Structure formats: structure tokens, C-alpha cells
Curated annotation (Swiss-Prot):
It comes from Paraburkholderia xenovorans (strain LB400). PANTHER family: RNA-BINDING PROTEIN HFQ. PROSITE patterns: SM. One of its GO terms (biological process) is regulation of RNA stability. One of its GO terms (molecular function) is RNA binding. Residues 10-69 form the Sm domain. This is RNA-binding protein Hfq. It comes from the Bacteria.
Length: 78
């Protein structure tokens, strides 16, 4: 993925992770997963509910937070 794509993706996922915001993740095949983002990298998202699932980013269609979240596209992952 290009660096430009990371400029929005990483701060958004990081804000969801840090604030423990519950999310619904819709996969390209229509399956809905729910939980909290535990961690992420360039290729995968770790989603925690009763178990931790490794979800490949290429399989994700949409990430929907349960509540509004403020994030800054220029912030870094920590």
C-alpha cells in the first residue's frame, strides 16, 4: 500500500485502538465481525472479542466505529 493510504488508515485505527472503541468490521464477502482493535500493522488487524482474530486488511471492506472518534491524520502510531 502506498504511504498516502497510510496517512488516514493508521491514525484512524490507532485512535480506535487507544480509545477502546467497539467496531464492526465488514469483510468483502459480507461477513460482519465485531470487537475492539487490539493491534494492527501494514497487513492485518487484530480484533478482540471473546477471542482474538487476525483479519487480513485485503479482506476488509468497511470499519464502522460504535461511536464517533476524533483522530488526526498527522499523528503517529504509539
Amino acid at each position: 500500500m502506498s504511504n498516502k493510504g497510510q496517512l488516514l488508515q493508521d491514525p484512524f485505527l490507532n485512535a480506535l485502538r487507544k480509545e477502546h472503541v467497539p467496531v464492526s468490521i465488514y469483510l468483502v464477502n459480507g461477513i460482519k465481525l465485531q470487537g475492539n482493535i487490539e493491534s494492527f500493522d501494514q497487513y492485518v488487524v487484530l480484533l478482540r472479542n471473546t477471542v482474538t482474530q487476525m483479519v487480513y486488511k485485503h479482506a476488509i471492506s468497511t470499519v464502522v466505529p460504535a461511536r464517533p472518534v476524533n483522530f488526526h491524520p498527522d499523528s503517529e502510531q504509539s
